[in-house]
């Protein structure tokens, strides 16, 4: 049974002999637990890989942090993991970190680094009324990269952006087992809901938001389509893994790294087990 011991930096089940086959190691990173939505898509497509999930609960959330801080922090964390494990591929499952840190990561490391971007292009193709909502953090909504995506792929649509850090907190709360109020979501979505023609397609531009998909569907008008980039990231990961030349292999069990063992993290452990992880450790930087 998994236990959390005060003063220790590890949460893990009792030791069980492992006869796992050798397989490539994929690191999935996010500032919080939203990246689990991306990890879950990848794992469904590629169930036999060795997975490490790392989240920066010490500096969460990234939305209000400076670009320089995010670049240095993400590079430092990925480096700390790769010093302990031979990585075949890294997925930055955080929109904010992806739009900022990918060039630095790709310059520093030789393994492929995959990022997530708001699914503006597929949403523009799916919309029926030409009105697309972009639901993201305020930082993602404001970034030039997001504006470039819209200008490139959605010129024929009306894009209505809505930035919300509250939804990130609600997604984390849901994963902790809390019930999310639909009326609270409707207050956040009010700028869209009071329009004569609200978006019929909504881009979930933060990896936390797919965790709230059921609640968002209940809060939005009937028939609203939700679009995220998780499945596309999974397909990209599968293609890259298939085309790697002699990737490093591991027989380790799936592992989660956090930056601080806290009571909140300890309560996450049963949930992380359901996602297929076998241990949770503090990552020393």
Curated annotation (Swiss-Prot):
<feature type="binding site">
    <location>
        <begin position="30"/>
        <end position="31"/>
    </location>
    <ligand>
        <name>substrate</name>
    </ligand>
</feature>
<protein>
    <recommendedName>
        <fullName>Glutamate racemase</fullName>
        <ecNumber>5.1.1.3</ecNumber>
    </recommendedName>
</protein>
<dbReference type="Pfam" id="PF01177">
    <property type="entry name" value="Asp_Glu_race"/>
</dbReference>
<keyword id="KW-0573">Peptidoglycan synthesis</keyword>
<keyword id="KW-0413">Isomerase</keyword>
<comment type="function">
    <text>Provides the (R)-glutamate required for cell wall biosynthesis.</text>
</comment>
<dbReference type="InterPro" id="IPR004391">
    <property type="entry name" value="Glu_race"/>
</dbReference>
<dbReference type="InterPro" id="IPR015942">
    <property type="entry name" value="Asp/Glu/hydantoin_racemase"/>
</dbReference>
<dbReference type="GO" id="GO:0008881">
    <property type="term" value="F:glutamate racemase activity"/>
</dbReference>
<dbReference type="GO" id="GO:0071555">
    <property type="term" value="P:cell wall organization"/>
</dbReference>
<feature type="active site" description="Proton donor/acceptor">
    <location>
        <position position="94"/>
    </location>
</feature>
<feature type="active site" description="Proton donor/acceptor">
    <location>
        <position position="206"/>
    </location>
</feature>
<keyword id="KW-0961">Cell wall biogenesis/degradation</keyword>
<feature type="binding site">
    <location>
        <begin position="95"/>
        <end position="96"/>
    </location>
    <ligand>
        <name>substrate</name>
    </ligand>
</feature>
<feature type="binding site">
    <location>
        <begin position="62"/>
        <end position="63"/>
    </location>
    <ligand>
        <name>substrate</name>
    </ligand>
</feature>
<feature type="binding site">
    <location>
        <begin position="207"/>
        <end position="208"/>
    </location>
    <ligand>
        <name>substrate</name>
    </ligand>
</feature>
<comment type="pathway">
    <text>Cell wall biogenesis; peptidoglycan biosynthesis.</text>
</comment>
<keyword id="KW-0133">Cell shape</keyword>
<dbReference type="GO" id="GO:0009252">
    <property type="term" value="P:peptidoglycan biosynthetic process"/>
</dbReference>
<dbReference type="InterPro" id="IPR033134">
    <property type="entry name" value="Asp/Glu_racemase_AS_2"/>
</dbReference>
<dbReference type="InterPro" id="IPR018187">
    <property type="entry name" value="Asp/Glu_racemase_AS_1"/>
</dbReference>
<dbReference type="GO" id="GO:0008360">
    <property type="term" value="P:regulation of cell shape"/>
</dbReference>
<comment type="similarity">
    <text>Belongs to the aspartate/glutamate racemases family.</text>
</comment>
<dbReference type="InterPro" id="IPR001920">
    <property type="entry name" value="Asp/Glu_race"/>
</dbReference>
């Amino acid at each position: 049974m998994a236990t959390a011991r005060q003063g220790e930096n590890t949460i893990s089940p009792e030791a069980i002999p492992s006869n796992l086959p050798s397989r490539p190691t994929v690191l999935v990173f996010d500032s919080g637990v939203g990246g689990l939505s991306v990890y879950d898509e990848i794992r469904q497509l590629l169930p036999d890989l060795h997975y490490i999930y790392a989240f920066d609960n010490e500096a969460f959330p990234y939305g209000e942090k400076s670009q320089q801080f995010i670049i240095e922090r993400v590079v430092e964390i990925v480096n700390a993991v790769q010093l302990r494990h031979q990585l075949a591929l890294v997925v930055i499952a955080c929109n904010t970190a992806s739009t900022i840190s990918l060039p630095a990561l790709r310059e520093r490391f030789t393994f492929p680094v995959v990022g997530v971007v708001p699914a503006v292009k597929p949403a523009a193709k799916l919309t029926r009324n030409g009105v697309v909502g972009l639901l993201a953090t305020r930082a993602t909504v404001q970034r030039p990269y997001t504006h470039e995506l819209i200008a490139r792929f959605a010129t024929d649509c009306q894009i209505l952006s809505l930035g919300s850090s509250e939804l990130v907190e609600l997604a984390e709360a849901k994963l902790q087992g809390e019930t999310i109020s639909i009326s609270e979501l409707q207050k956040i979505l009010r700028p869209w809901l009071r329009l004569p023609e609200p978006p019929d397609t909504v881009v979930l531009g933060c990896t936390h938001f797919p965790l709230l998909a059921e609640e968002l569907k209940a809060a939005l008008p009937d028939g609203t389509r939700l679009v995220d980039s998780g499945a596309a990231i999974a397909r990209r990961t599968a293609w890259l893994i298939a085309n790697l030349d002699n990737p490093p292999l591991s027989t380790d069990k799936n592992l989660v790294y956090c930056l601080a063992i806290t009571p909140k993290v300890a309560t996450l452990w049963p949930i992380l087990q359901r996602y297929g992880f076998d241990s949770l450790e503090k990552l020393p930087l």
